[in-house]
Swiss-Prot record:
EC class: transferase
CDD domains named among the record's database cross-references: Bbox2_TRIM5-like, RING-HC_TRIM5-like_C-IV
Pfam families referenced in this protein's UniProt entry, alphabetically: SPRY, zf-B_box, zf-RING_UBOX
Classification via Gene3D superfamilies: 2.60.120.920, Classic Zinc Finger (3.30.160.60), Zinc/RING finger domain, C3HC4 (zinc finger) (3.30.40.10)
Positions of post-translational Phosphoserine modification: S86
Underlying gene: TRIM5
InterPro entries in the record: B30.2/SPRY (IPR001870), B30.2/SPRY_sf (IPR043136), Butyrophylin_SPRY (IPR003879), ConA-like_dom_sf (IPR013320), SPRY_dom (IPR003877), TRIM/RBCC (IPR050143), Znf-RING_euk (IPR027370), Znf_B-box (IPR000315)
Designated name of the protein: Tripartite motif-containing protein 5
Pathway: Protein modification; protein ubiquitination
Function field: Capsid-specific restriction factor that prevents infection from non-host-adapted retroviruses. Blocks viral replication early in the life cycle, after viral entry but before reverse transcription. In addition to acting as a capsid-specific restriction factor, also acts as a pattern recognition receptor that activates innate immune signaling in response to the retroviral capsid lattice.
Length: 547
């Protein structure tokens, strides 16, 4: 209300020409008042153009001598100036930057607060203007809605910012993991190549050692042969240069010895018969390595289960087993093969575990069917798939074998009339019999292809008597298939596929090469891991994925 009163008063004491508070106001006959400077300037301008003097507002003529000072308006204008220049009033009311007046109006078209002089200017003429108090509530509500909307957008923006940071961190971790995996994969590839290089160099060193040793022996033989001939030549020269008696002394014996002299040629090595170095099949090696990586995805946590009676000792963490001699009866020979089962048993799915057999001279490992098998095996003849055992083993430090079923009908087979190959084929009612026919002991030295991609070299089957000291030619002894490996396994991987009915063994030491695979296994009961340290005091240890 006070603002409106001040506004009305200010309008009354404002010069219509300069639109400022009256300065030395002069009143005309018509009653309008103007600043002395403003009306004087207007008087000169109107006289110049029109030849007469008239009020700038109502155009009523006036005489210059009739202009009279208006002290009352001058006092009011002066008081208003004092109010406008008051610090308290200046703090309460914002003022127009152009006119210095209070900003009491709101222009809807421009959306700005203006003073009353701005409202009368050409810029805002015809615009809808309202008192600030009238529109403040309306725009306060609008701004409140806008504030809530912006706060929600700010929350959304902060969430998006957090999502971006989270995604950035996730990608960084993922890329770091990829870098780690790439470094690990290429390190493993380099390790494979380094291993192959080391093997090739070792083979060359062995070849060099054997070759030079043989040639050195040949050189010694040639030196002795040359010395012997020099002695004979010297004897002949002495006889020919000496007396008749010396010439004829034991002449027949000398001639006989000379005739018996045979020139021994040194043992040589033809270069074309040397083993030719071939670059490793990197593609094949990578395939083998890939297969090992695939089966290692099914790593199972296996622990060892003690058996009774037993000549084995299991560690506290149930991950290591070793042979222990029966101290209370040292003179009694063990009548069974000591072994332990692993836990858990498997009835479905794929499962993989690895066993450290470093430096052991004998061991047996694989899987067995629980209801058919026992941990302590009465005899070697029990290690057969038909008895529930699918195992491989090492004996005598370097003889690796896979234990297959004995072939029926072939134990006492004796070929006649040099026709053993054909007769063997007629009697081969399964692949085992067919395989056993093609052996060097049966005059067959062959390789073959089976089931499109299974290549085999046919070797003599190992007898049971070759496995253990003593003589045992029982017809039920297992067929022991020799396993030939360029690198002796220090770590063996076992992969059980219950659905495919297969048990596979991998040489982890040799970059995952397949050692042997049992196919078409019949698992009618839960299948358990099997371990036998044999009569070797060094332990067998279950490995962890990180070891």
């Amino acid at each position: 209300m006070a603002s409106e009163i001040l506004l009305n008063i200010k309008e009354e004491v404002t010069c219509p020409i300069c639109l400022e508070l009256l300065t030395e106001p002069l009143s005309l006959d018509c009653g309008h008042s103007f600043c002395q400077a403003c009306i004087t300037a207007n008087h000169k301008e109107s006289t110049l153009h029109q030849g007469e003097r008239s009020c700038p507002l109502c155009r009523v003529s006036y005489q210059s001598e009739n202009l009279r000072p208006n002290r009352h308006l001058a006092n009011i204008a002066e008081r208003l100036r004092e109010v406008m220049l008051s610090p308290e009033e200046g703090q309460k009311v914002d003022r127009c930057a152009r006119h210095g007046e209070k900003l009491l109006l709101f222009c809807q078209q421009h959306g700005n607060v203006i003073c009353w002089l701005c409202e009368r200017s050409q810029e805002h003429r015809g615009h809808s203007t309202f008192l600030v108090e009238e529109v403040a509530q309306k725009y306060q509500e609008k701004l409140q809605v806008a504030l809530e909307m912006m706060r929600q957008k700010q929350q959304d923006a902060e969430k998006l910012e957090a999502d971006v940071r989270e995604e950035q961190a996730s990608w960084k971790i993922q890329i770091e993991n990829d870098k780690t995996n790439i470094l690990a994969e290429f390190k493993q590839l380099r390790d494979i190549l380094d291993c192959e290089e080391s093997n090739e160099l070792q083979n060359l060193e062995k070849e060099e050692e054997n070759l030079l040793k043989t040639l050195a022996q040949s050189e010694n033989d040639m030196v002795l042969q040359t010395q012997s001939m020099r002695v004979l030549i010297a004897d002949l020269e002495h006889r020919l240069q000496g007396s008749v008696m010396e010439l004829l002394q034991d002449v027949e014996g000398v001639i006989k010895r000379i005739k018996n002299v045979t020139l021994q040629k040194p043992k040589t090595f033809l270069n074309e018969k040397r083993r030719v170095f071939r670059a490793p099949d990197l593609k094949g090696m990578l395939q083998v390595f890939k297969e090992l990586k695939e089966v290692q995805c099914y790593w199972a946590h296996v622990t060892l289960v003690p058996s009774h009676p037993s000549c084995t000792v299991i560690s506290e963490d149930e991950r290591q087993v070793r042979y222990q001699e029966q101290i209370h009866q040292p003179s009694v020979k063990v009548k069974y093969f000591c072994g332990v089962l692993g836990s858990p048993g498997f009835t479905s799915g794929k499962h993989y575990w690895e066993v450290d057999v470093s430096d052991k001279s004998a061991w047996i490992l694989g899987v067995c069917v629980s209801l058919k098998c026992t941990a302590n095996v009465p005899g070697i003849e029990n290690y057969q798939p038909k008895n529930g055992y699918w195992v491989i083993g090492l004996q005598n430090a370097n003889n690796y074998s896979a234990f297959q079923d004995a072939v029926p009908g072939t134990e006492n087979y004796q070929p006649k009339n040099g026709n053993r190959r054909n007769k063997g084929l007629r009697n081969a009612d399964n692949y085992s019999a067919f395989r056993d026919t093609f052996q060097p002991i049966n005059d067959s030295w062959v390789t073959g292809l089976r089931n499109v991609d299974n290549y085999n070299a046919f070797q003599d089957a190992v007898k049971y008597s070759d496995f253990q000291d003593g003589s045992c030619s029982t017809p039920s002894a297992p067929l022991m298939v020799p396993l030939f490996m360029t690198i002796c396994p220090k770590r063996v991987g076992v992969f059980l596929d219950c659905k495919a009915c297969t048990v596979s063994f991998f040489n982890v030491t040799s970059n995952g090469c397949l050692i042997y695979k049992f196919s078409k296994c019949h698992f009618s009961y839960p299948v358990f891991p099997y371990f036998s340290p044999m009569i070797c005091k060094l332990p067998m240890t279950l490995c962890s994925p990180s070891s």
